From Swiss-Prot:
Domain of life: Eukaryota
Compartment annotation: Nucleus
Record region (Interaction with the F-box domain of F-box proteins): 105-163
UniProt note on tissues of expression: Mostly expressed in inflorescence and siliques, and, to a lower extent, in seedlings, roots, and stems.
SUPFAM superfamilies xrefs: POZ domain, Skp1 dimerisation domain-like
Cited function: Involved in ubiquitination and subsequent proteasomal degradation of target proteins. Together with CUL1, RBX1 and a F-box protein, it forms a SCF E3 ubiquitin ligase complex. The functional specificity of this complex depends on the type of F-box protein. In the SCF complex, it serves as an adapter that links the F-box protein to CUL1.
Record GO cellular component, one term: nucleus
Homology family: Belongs to the SKP1 family.
Main location: nucleus
Keywords on record: Nucleus, Ubl conjugation pathway
Gene giving rise to this polypeptide: ASK4
Annotated pathway: Protein modification; protein ubiquitination
Annotated Gene3D superfamilies: Potassium Channel Kv1.1, Chain A
Protein's name according to its UniProt entry: SKP1-like protein 4
């Protein structure tokens, strides 16, 4: 007899519902705690996550659950070809526009999905690598609200960062 998998319903801020396996849902510590506290019977509302972003989060969690299952608890998984495939998948996953990437960071933080938070924050850090403060401001559309004097003072106090 086939084992039936427990399903969980997640409800996005814009009213979309997603029915997913509990094993995928518990990649989120936030959702895991709600399930443990018996708060999942009528679906779990996620008021801080839109349907589009939740779909991406679910895609990430599902891929990582499947990869772990395929590895079968193999301790050498993290040095294996399968892990290289997952790393490649992850690097493609974060090749999204900037607003989506930032929304994924917020969702990963809200849902407490450490791997996704690390991945998305690393993607932003990689975008910053090698850029001057001016280039970063332009890239992230950040207004410089320092006076020239204040900026010179900050640069002087933090010379090590500009070497």
């Amino acid at each position: 007899m086939a084992e039936t998998k427990k399903m969980i319903i997640l409800k996005s801020s814009d009213g979309e519902s997603f029915e997913i396996e509990e094993a995928v849902a518990v990649k989120s510590q936030t959702i895991k705690h709600m399930i443990e506290d018996d708060c999942a019977d009528n679906g779990i509302p996620l008021p801080n996550v839109t349907g589009a972003i939740l779909a991406k989060v679910i895609e990430y969690c599902k891929k990582h659950v499947e990869a772990a299952a395929e590895a079968g608890g193999d301790k050498d998984f993290y040095g294996s070809a399968e892990n290289d495939e997952l790393k490649n998948w992850d690097s493609e996953f974060v090749k999204v526009d900037q607003p989506t990437l930032f929304d994924l960071i917020l969702a990963a933080n809200y849902l407490n999905i450490g791997g996704l938070l690390d991945l998305t924050c690393k993607a932003v850090a990689d975008q910053m690598r090698g850029k001057t403060p001016e280039q970063m401001r332009a890239h992230f559309n950040i207004k410089n609200d320092y006076t020239p004097e204040e900026e010179a003072e900050v640069r002087n106090e933090n010379k090590w960062a500009f070497e």
